Amino acid sequence: MLFRFPCVTRFFQRWQQHADPHDIVAHFPVSLRTVQRWFARFEQRGDDGIAPDYHQCGQQQVQQTAPPLVEHLCQTRRDHPRWGAEMIRLELEDHYDTVPCARTVQRHLGHAGLQPAPAGRTPAAVYPRVPRAERPHQRWQMDASEDLRLKGPQRVCWLRVVDECSGAFLKTVVFAAARWEHVDRHQIQEGLRQVFAGWGLPEQFRVDNGYPWGSTGEFPPEMALWLIGLGIEMVWIPPACPQQNGVVERAQGTGQNWAAPQTCGHLAELQQRCDELERRQRERYPYRDGRSRWDVYPTLHQACRKYRRRAERSAWDVSKVWAAVAQHVVKRRVDCTGSVSLYHRTRYVGKPHIGKAVYVSLDPSGPTWVFADEAGNELRTHAADELTAERICSLSVAGRKGKRS
């Protein structure tokens, strides 16, 4: 046996002499990792590790896939044409004790003439890499998708929340409105409370600049203020840069492929299907080395900061809101009445400043709105009576335009 594999035999002899793998690499055209693997093999088997394991090569299939199971998996592809082999296999696990691997599922689909599921979209350009969260619940991403057609004439929209580190689908809340901007802000708030009740509070939220938490250089809107008061740091991506919210953007496409809203008869059916598929994606869908996200990230099961609806008011901190707003300075142009608008509430600055630019900031000690000219001279102050805990939590910070405060 020692002479049939001369190169391996030399490795074995060097291993017996306790040689350094780095020295062997210097004399043989092999990688360090290869030598280390051979040494580990000799350590485990001795001289029996010299011969190759030809008898163990390849996979042996115990039995062929039963025809009813093959027909079931093919019918599943017909019913869900955008499902991949892994998702079909997980669907079969709910009905059979033993199911074939994903590669076998692909082979049966090919023999049946069923085209493979469409691949994901490839990026059109190379974008700057955005640092990703390093642990579960460090940062969540959320995004809305609208105008989702159901089986009938009804159209709905949904809000999807995804953990940035693991990519786990945490919750999708479906709303009856077709347009996202038509969903009442209080319904969105209650939807987020559902997410918090099930998962706790994240450290950060990464969002875009759309309704109802968008901020394009202005003061944070009332929905963002409410989240900040819960101790959640808001991270706004630059305008027109959805790739910086890429985890949830990809989840939106995958979620629509899996849930297939057009096959649901009503909103409740779509909501139930989303809940089931999200649980499957977290707990069973292969993510890394065949393991699910649930197994790869044990801390994904629950965020460190728990949330209880009844204790929200006692845990909510208005001082965090004032500190966050105080970091912003907003430019305004004084109108013909000598006033400017803040949160759709009119604030009087003075008629001598009509047509001039003023800069508005918040003094958190009051809290007080401070109006200054371009030179930094203070012009006027107003009590920030709209930034109370009661108004922020009830999402009634913003008033109607033209109403004097």
Placement of each model-derived feature along the sequence:
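Short, amphipathic alpha-helical "recognition" segments used to contact nucleic acids or chromatin
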Residues: 2-19, 70-79
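Short alpha-helical "recognition helix" segments of helix-turn-helix
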Residues: 23-28, 88
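Key DNA-contact positions within bacterial/archaeal DNA-binding proteins
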Residues: 33, 37, 103
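Basic, flexible linker segments flanking DNA-binding modules
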Residues: 49-142, 147, 299-302
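Mobile-element integrase/transposase regions
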Residues: 63, 98-99, 109-168, 182-194, ...
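A short acidic/small-residue loop/turn micro-motif
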Residues: 163-164, 175-183, 386-387
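Charged alpha-helix within mobile-element recombinases
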Residues: 173, 216, 223-315, 364
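C-terminal, beta-rich DNA-binding module of retroviral/retroelements integrases
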Residues: 282-405
